[in-house]
Amino acid sequence: MTPVDATIRPVERADLLAVVRIERTCFSDPWPYDAFERLLEEPAFLVAEWEGAVVGYVVADSTPNHGRDIGHVKDFAVHPEARKRGVGRTLLRSALVRLHAVGVAVVRLEVRESNAAARSLYADEGFDPIRRISNYYRDGEDAFVLVVDLAEWTAGE
């Protein structure tokens, strides 16, 4: 599968079971179905579909902030069998484009210290670390908070 083979589209309620299955496959402390159900209206809750199956998703929101809205990538995963094919990068870029379109100026996210692949992707896309949060995850692992300025990101595209 190459990046052009995957279709990125807004999530639909019918996708939630597939999203939860990917969540459970990818994370040791997965979000429950109802958490995703509450997020259906987020501006950048997108899925990647390949050959009729959902293989990844991203959930990102927007919060007003005195004319410089802040986006937050809340959750992001690609099924292990669909990794290393550009699906994650395409999902992330699609979410950033959508957030920019609704007026978001800066996007932030948290990433596990041990998640080298994700940290590399985020660095490639212009995210910069701004702080470390000790014991952020339930298992005690630290997180890095990363941010990207969407005006700079879009200028670099």
Report the location of each language-model feature.
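Acetyl-CoA-dependent GNAT
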Residues: 3, 10-81, 89-94, 98-102, ...
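Conserved SAM-binding loop
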Residues: 8, 111
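C-terminal "cap" of GNAT-fold acetyltransferases
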Residues: 45, 105, 112-116, 135-157
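Generic domain-boundary/flexible-linker signal
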Residues: 69, 118-122, 157
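Conserved active-site alpha-helix within GNAT-family acetyltransferase domains
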Residues: 85, 89, 114-144
